[in-house]
Each structure stands twice: as structure tokens, then as C-alpha cells.
Amino acid sequence: METILEQQRRYHEEKERLMDVMAKEMLTKKSTLRDQINSDHRTRAMQDRYMEVSGNLRDLYDDKDGLRKEELNAISGPNEFAEFYNRLKQIKEFHRKHPNEICVPMSVEFEELLKARENPSEEAQNLVEFTDEEGYGRYLDLHDCYLKYINLKASEKLDYITYLSIFDQLFDIPKERKNAEYKRYLEMLLEYLQDYTDRVKPLQDQNELFGKIQAEFEKKWENGTFPGWPKETSSALTHAGAHLDLSAFSSWEELASLGLDRLKSALLALGLKCGGTLEERAQRLFSTKGKSLESLDTSLFAKNPKSKGTKRDTERNKDIAFLEAQIYEYVEILGEQRHLTHENVQRKQARTGEEREEEEEEQISESESEDEENEIIYNPKNLPLGWDGKPIPYWLYKLHGLNINYNCEICGNYTYRGPKAFQRHFAEWRHAHGMRCLGIPNTAHFANVTQIEDAVSLWAKLKLQKASERWQPDTEEEYEDSSGNVVNKKTYEDLKRQGLL
């Protein structure tokens, strides 16, 4: 049986070897997306083992059962030599009873691990399960979520490629449509995005990500700035109307002289019923003189049917909004996969059935050749990779202007490669969301505007221009005096006050 100190030594050795293997794994160059994903999963498995070993080691150092202390006292006491020979005797006795016991050093286990990485088996090359549509982590497969979305009540009917462009624009969906069925759709979409992220980016700490999303969401929810969920104002019955000082009135008849509208406004300010005749309103309002709202008869107050279940509805809305917040974050993380999915679906729709079959056969043969050759792709100019995972031709790279980078401050300093992607992004969700956060409509006036300061100044200029073009009755409305002279409204009013007409 291993001693406590030997267990601690073995755990320390395993931690160091795990750190060494993880460092080598991360430094190894990955030639394909499949290699990158498999490498990340191997690294995560070693990280999990590292955390498990660290936990075991901490428990041994805590020594809650006192065994470590007893062992230290035994080997450091006055009879240390007797303890040494006693343990040596136990070891010899063990090997006498088990003469064929094989002990594999830890170094051999880790060497086998490195060999398995350099020469992976067929099973090791497919560490994660992906659908055919997902292309081993290259594309998203949102067909089930799409079917769920188009079957929602009152949802607009759209095709799959349009859904890929707008499925994260949840802030555009009216609050009235965000019911229990909509919540189930969000849960389904979020579950897929979380599972896909776990498969494609296994090193992403989703617990830490959840805490970050929750903290940001709580802050925005309290401030009423979360997209699609503006802060609800309180009931009109508690804030509408104007209070009236009743100390200046000695009877309800005096109140009646104020008229129906003024009495209604005062009753609304107190949350009381505001209907009835002039006398009834005056009597109802006068009955509150010198009394607190708590002491008034409950029959005097207006019934607000919306107040029932308000707290429950608020909690339900908050749960739905939190699901949306998580979806926004995961879509941001999977932005590259989403863009590639959109292009892949477009390309498939533009091809005939025969061309699609040929493409699938080519992909199968290429994947087989990649597995056989496993060569590192030569890419000295750092060109973008095509749909086949290989660098695109340099002439095509220059033709599309992909060597030119465009930054957009409104999109959070996001970088777009090439003029085509840059021009297209003005109509996409990221730029539209940035403009919405600035409180500016994303119209044609703001095409090619990427700086926040430029957009704000242009919006102020447009508002001034619209204000100057607005019709002004004082100077533009015309009147005719008794002599037949045509003058504007302001001049006419001045002449009328002076009695010159």
C-alpha cells in the first residue's frame, strides 16, 4: 500500500508531466480545423485531470483524518531506522506474494500519450461527434431551431438562409409574441449553441462565461437598457394628472367650480375613480381632504387589472430576456462559424443536385487524402482559407481586395477584410445594433460612416435640417386684411392688437 507521502509525490509528478504535455500540445502546429478541435479536446481532458489531481493533493495536505501527521511522526521519531526496515520488509513481502506484478512508470504512460498524438488512430481522429451538416465544426446546423421558429404563433414565414441572418435579432420581435412557446424556442436554440460551443471550443470556460453574462445582464436590466426590453413605466393611474391642494376649499361646491377636466386630473393623481358627474367627482375628491390614502375606502380607488400578476410577469419577462442575453453572447463567439454557414448554404442553393453530389464526393476524397497525408499547408502570405480548408489563390485574394482591412468603430472596432464585406456590413445586424445603441436610425444617410463622432454629428445636422424645413405657421401662414393686403400670421396679429385693421 502506498504511503501518504508517496501519493503526494506521485501527484506532484503527474501535475508537472501534465503541464509539460499541455504545453507541447498547444505549441504543436495544427494544419486543419479537425486537428485544432481534437487538440483542444485533448488539452481540456488534461486540464480536467490536472484539476482532479490538484484537488486530491489539497485533500492530502489538509490531512483531515490525521494520517499524514502520524506518518511524519513515525519516520521522524527516535525509531526511524526500525520504521525504515519495517517498511522494507512489507515491500519484500508484497513482491513475494505477487512475483509477476508489473509496475508501469508514469513516464512511459505519457510517452505513449505523445506517440498516440503523433500517430492517431481512426478513433482518435474523431474525438467529437458532429452531424454531416456541421462539417466537423466548420458550420452550424440550425435546421431544427429553424423549424421550431417558423412554427411559432404569428411568426413571419422565411427561408433558412434568411433565418441564418436574423435569428439573433431577438430585440426586433414584439414583446407581445414572447410567450411560453417562444421561451421554449429560446431554450432549444441556447441548448444547441452551448453544446456546439462545447464541441468546437472546448477550452471556453462556460461557467465563467455564464457569470459574466449574468452580471452584465443584471446591470442592463436594472437600467432598462437591455435591447428589446425597455424599462416599463409605472401605471398611468399613479402618475397621470396633477395634484390639487384641498386646503383652499371649504365645500365640494367650490371644487365643482373647477370643472370636469381639472377634477379628473386631481382624482387620477390620487389613483381614485375619475368617472361620474361633476357633483360626484367633486364630492369624491372633497372626501379625501385631510385624510391619508391608506385611510380611504378601497371602493374609491380605481381598479387596475394589469396590477395582478405584474410581479410574476416581470420575472417571466426577465427569464426570457436572460435567455436572449446568453444567445447574443454565444452568437458573438460563433461569429466565424455563422458567417461560413451562411456562405455554405448560399453556395449549395446555387448548385444543381448533380453538382452537390460531386462536391460531397470531392470532400470525402479530400478528407481521406488529408487523413493519409496529414501535411502542413504551406501558407507564407497568411491568406484566408477557402471552404476546403486550403489558402485561396493569391490573385483571387488581391482581386477581392482582401489585403485591405476596414475598421468600424460603430461595430465595436470590428475589422472587415475587403471592400465587399465592408460595404455589406452596413446592412447587417452588427452595424444596425451599434446604430441602435447610439439612438440613430440606420438609414442611407449614414452609408460609409464608421466613426461614432461622425455619425452623431451627422445626425445632429440632419435634425437641424429637418427642423428648418418644418412648416412654421407664424411666418408662413398668410392672412388678408380688410384692404386686401396679404400678410403673414405674426404681422396680422400685431396689426389686429393695435387696431389698425
UniProtKB/Swiss-Prot annotation:
Q: Which sequence positions carry the modification called N-acetylmethionine?
A: 1
Recorded GO terms, molecular function?
A: RNA binding; zinc ion binding
Q: Where is the composition biased (Acidic residues)?
A: 355-374
> Under the cellular component aspect of Gene Ontology, which terms does the record hold?
catalytic step 2 spliceosome; nuclear speck; nucleoplasm; nucleus; spliceosomal complex; U2 snRNP; U2-type precatalytic spliceosome; U2-type spliceosomal complex
Localization terms from the record: Nucleus speckle; Nucleus
Q: Does the keyword DNA repair apply?
A: no
**PROSITE patterns in the cross-refs:** ZF_MATRIN (PS50171)
Q: Could you tell me which InterPro entries the record lists for this protein?
A: Matrin/U1-C_Znf_C2H2 (IPR000690), RNA_Proc_DNA_Dmg_Regulator (IPR051421), SDE2/SF3A3_SAP (IPR025086), SF3A3_dom (IPR031774), SF3a60/Prp9_C (IPR024598), SF3a60_bindingd (IPR021966)
Self-association state and partner proteins as the record states? Component of the 17S U2 SnRNP complex, a ribonucleoprotein complex that contains small nuclear RNA (snRNA) U2 and a number of specific proteins. Part of the SF3A subcomplex of the 17S U2 SnRNP complex which is composed of three subunits; SF3A3/SAP61, SF3A2/SAP62 and SF3A1/SAP114. SF3A associates with the splicing factor SF3B and a 12S RNA unit to form the mature 17S U2 small nuclear ribonucleoprotein complex (17S U2 snRNP). Identified in the spliceosome 'E' complex, a precursor of the spliceosome 'A' complex. Identified in the spliceosome 'A' and 'B' complexes.
| Function field | Component of the 17S U2 SnRNP complex of the spliceosome, a large ribonucleoprotein complex that removes introns from transcribed pre-mRNAs. The 17S U2 SnRNP complex (1) directly participates in early spliceosome assembly and (2) mediates recognition of the intron branch site during pre-mRNA splicing by promoting the selection of the pre-mRNA branch-site adenosine, the nucleophile for the first step of splicing.
Q: Which family does it belong to?
A: Belongs to the SF3A3 family.
The identity of this protein, by name, is Splicing factor 3A subunit 3
Q: Which gene encodes it?
A: SF3A3
